[in-house]
């Protein structure tokens, strides 16, 4: 069956922002104007179409990335609405990995906020072209100029308005288009009814100057346009749009729009800008992967190429079971076809193919290059896996997910719960790559780890509501880590004789710090001093010991282990002997005195009235906080600090008390850092 929409008329975009900037409301209005929904839902009322999870509706926030498809001016727009809370940043990251463009929503009063900076960095990492929508122009305190200024100050980007607001706060009533040099006045409460007007007299000179600023940015992009401008020739709207599009596609420039999604003002202009300035799959570079011999393979965005896709999300649907979301980069595939999971080297069957709208679905028979869809039947596929035609061996770059920083022990309340809890936790860990489950080797307790207190709260809530599992939990604990600080070469020799065949394994391993590169194993054995069939056992022994830690049972991270020598016995050597020998070698590093405890450091941003600065800073200092920056804004101050996570439990209550409930804060994981000696000794003592 031929595709309904040509690739050049397809857009794959995300909506991203800080929490409460209006992402989901913006998406709802887009769906309303494109005819996808006929009643507008509100996040604060708990009836948003895109926030379909019970936990989202209760909290008025987006937790997962919801996907939908809309149509505007003969174009198909695939939209992913992403979370704004820092605990769910990974949802944004994996969505950006498969998108071609994005709309960044900025609060007109707050400007660029902490999570805006985080998701902007993620989008820059993936080289995603973006347009910017300054939302909530009707809000008390809204300032378009201030919001635009924060784009330069906090993001350091090349952005310029292509629109100007007519009025602000309660007086926000229209938009000036700097390309057309005309105005739009909204009639009533939305942009359903509007009229085209001349630019108000008091704005004409200002608008003209802003248009000139816009044109003068393009001397590096279009010499002909600059020459026309310098020679006093008229610059056509089409010419300007084309140059803006080219610069936006390269992520060299970011057009700025304005409006109020809640009041339905300016939303149609966003849709026009998505089509005018954001890329189709054909505008994006060909996808690059490699084969098992590490040779580069390039796939063009075309239906005629071999099927190539990347899985980016897994979720459990109560009616159809496991759903795997994937982006098709090349080729086509039909329902019922077999594909290869090239990452895991297993064959999978696409039982059903679905076009999703939040949690509702439409069955489709075939998918094409550029599509974002969900499949039923992929049993072994997880986020980051490459799906290909049978016998194809291309593997796309996978996804990197941060390690969780907070954990709790969990146990089922009843025998019935015990039977269900393992399956439920396993399904939840498939959906959340930053949610981990492990067993404490000393206490035999099941430990669950996540990115923050809200993340844990959502997991526990879903256990109860979706999987009907009641569980007891203890207080959240910090997920400490261990690491090496200097190079050491140690020996592990395991010999056992007990009559008959014995056990013999002998290794010499050099251990060294591997800063921010994870754990790495290198085999430098030459001449067969250890037969190659025992090398995987050495690696396995190290992996298990690294995960169990040495000082206090916390996983060892950022360690490079190089196997440099050893010996074997023709009769007595075995895989288990070499596995134990490797573990013994790692444990010897404790005697070298170069192991340390690492603690997670959080980036904390507090917004407080001026009256309480002393209280807030004094409290942060008492929590081992390091002040990074202070930024005054009207009658408030924004304080940025780095604070160990262990000092932040219960902080919300203390902050309320210190500021009479008038301050707010947000925090996100930044890095692991060596714990002070007295703190480390206390941690080790508790664990041992």
From Swiss-Prot:
It comes from the Bacteria. GTP binds at residues 17-24, 81-85, 135-138. One of its GO terms (molecular function) is GTP binding. GO terms for biological process: ribosome disassembly. Residues 8-282 form the tr-type G domain. It is found in: Cytoplasm. Pfam families: EFG_C (PF00679), EFG_III (PF14492), EFG_IV (PF03764), GTP_EFTU (PF00009), GTP_EFTU_D2 (PF03144). GO terms for cellular component: cytoplasm. Keywords: Cytoplasm, Elongation factor, GTP-binding, Nucleotide-binding, Protein biosynthesis. The keyword GTP-binding applies. Catalyzes the GTP-dependent ribosomal translocation step during translation elongation. During this step, the ribosome changes from the pre-translocational (PRE) to the post-translocational (POST) state as the newly formed A-site-bound peptidyl-tRNA and P-site-bound deacylated tRNA move to the P and E sites, respectively. Catalyzes the coordinated movement of the two tRNA molecules, the mRNA and conformational changes in the ribosome. NCBIfam families: EF-G, PRK12740.1-5, small_GTP. Belongs to the TRAFAC class translation factor GTPase superfamily. Classic translation factor GTPase family. EF-G/EF-2 subfamily. This is Elongation factor G. The lineage of its organism: Bacteria, Bacillati, Mycoplasmatota, Mollicutes, Acholeplasmatales.
